[in-house]
Amino acid sequence: MKTLLLTLVVVTIVCLDLGYSLICFNQETYRPETTTTCPDGEDTCYSTFWNDHHGVKIERGCGCPRVNPPISIICCKTDKCNN
């Protein structure tokens, strides 16, 4: 009986995928590709874009921060969606 109960608990945890954390890209313009695991409860990745005297700048990470023009932002909700 205990074995059955333990088996049901393990199957429930695996099926519910408890503790899932979103993975987002977090590299900046022209840097090697890197990722980060977002904090618990964070379910969004972002990419921001803006121009400066060197050209287009890009920043990526977890969350969906507010930005002001001329910065543009794209937010998404799946692993590695912000590349």
UniProtKB/Swiss-Prot annotation:
Keywords: Disulfide bond, Secreted, Signal, Toxin. GO terms for molecular function: toxin activity. It comes from Ophiophagus hannah (King cobra). Disulfide bonds join C24-C45, C38-C62, C64-C75, C76-C81. This is Weak toxin DE-1. Expressed by the venom gland. It comes from the Eukaryota. SUPFAM superfamilies: Snake toxin-like. Belongs to the three-finger toxin family. Short-chain subfamily. Type I alpha-neurotoxin sub-subfamily. It is found in: Secreted. InterPro entries: Snake_3FTx (IPR003571), Snake_toxin-like_sf (IPR045860), Snake_toxin_con_site (IPR018354), Toxin_cobra-type (IPR054131). It holds the Pfam family Toxin_cobra-type.
